[in-house]
């Protein structure tokens, strides 16, 4: 009873370090965190943007520890470099929720994310089916120093193994639309026969589409992305720019729900895996199809 009364009226401060706000998906994550936190008047979130810098993000986590926040939420830029500062915060007694990109080891309170390998595998399976098991594919990877980039690639490669799907051009577009467009321009110059583009996120798929459209080849190429934001991937799909996208939840509301429990002394799972959906032109109006 004493423990419960001690939390009544208490103000909680959460430090949130976002690796970058240059990606629309991450802007939406912060918006979802803010919206979910607004339901709890005792919660205050301090948002920080690491501006795509590992050093800045490491410093931000250290600042949160020094300022004595009650809980830290981190969406890491890269896996290995963020492991140490997150572990230090955790060992200092501050709960840490890691979103989207995993870190090494288990020195954190909770990880929340969807299964990127399963999403990549589902995308690969759809690609094999759509191309009838053979064709030339351009793969535009996400940052391969991050777990989502690695896992979306791994799942895709698992699905196409043993088929006649040939990845004729691969590039790390670092989640950025402009880099994806530039890489696709190179692929189009080198290869006259491209059947499909598999991009690790929707901005990458859209960047590839723009490159192909500029040279009159977009109608002959299938474009596949990941994220499935209503304002982005689903809009691209509805307008015919891309052909399929796989939803990766922003984790925002789930993070706040977990944070609230943790701050009140309740246990949460070490890993919370969120569900995903596949969207195509055929099922968009029906809300997509859940992944198995």
What label would you give each PLM region?
Residues 1-292:
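A residue-level marker of the well-folded mature domains of exported/periplasmic proteins
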């Amino acid at each position: 009873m004493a423990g419960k009364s001690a939390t009544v009226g208490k103000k909680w401060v959460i430090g949130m370090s976002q690796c970058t706000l240059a990606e629309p998906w991450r802007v939406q994550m912060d918006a979802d965190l803010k919206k979910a936190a607004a339901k709890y008047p005792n919660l205050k979130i301090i948002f920080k943007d690491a501006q795509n810098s590992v050093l800045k993000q490491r410093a931000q986590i250290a600042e949160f520890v020094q300022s004595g926040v009650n809980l830290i939420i981190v969406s890491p830029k890269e896996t290995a470099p963020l492991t140490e500062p997150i572990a230090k915060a955790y060992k200092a007694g501050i709960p840490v929720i890691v979103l989207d990109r995993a870190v090494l080891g288990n020195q954190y309170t909770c990880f929340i994310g969807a299964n990127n390998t399963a999403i990549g595998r589902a995308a690969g399976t759809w690609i094999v089916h759509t191309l009838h098991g053979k064709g030339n594919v351009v793969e535009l990877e996400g940052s391969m120093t991050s777990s989502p980039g690695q896992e979306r690639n791994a799942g895709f490669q698992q699905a196409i193994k043993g088929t006649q799907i040939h990845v004729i051009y691969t590039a790390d577009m670092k989640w950025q639309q402009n880099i994806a467009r530039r890489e696709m321009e190179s692929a189009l110059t080198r290869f006259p026969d491209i059947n499909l583009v598999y991009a690790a996120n929707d901005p990458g798929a859209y960047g590839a589409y723009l490159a192909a459209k500029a040279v009159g080849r977009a109608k002959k190429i299938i474009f596949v992305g990941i994220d499935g934001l209503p304002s982005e991937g689903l809009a691209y799909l509805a307008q015919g720019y891309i052909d399929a996208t796989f939803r990766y939840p922003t984790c925002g509301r789930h993070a706040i729900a977990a944070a609230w429990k943790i701050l009140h002394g309740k246990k949460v799972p070490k890993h919370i895996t969120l569900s995903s959906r596949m969207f195509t032109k055929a099922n968009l109006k029906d809300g997509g199809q859940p992944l198995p």
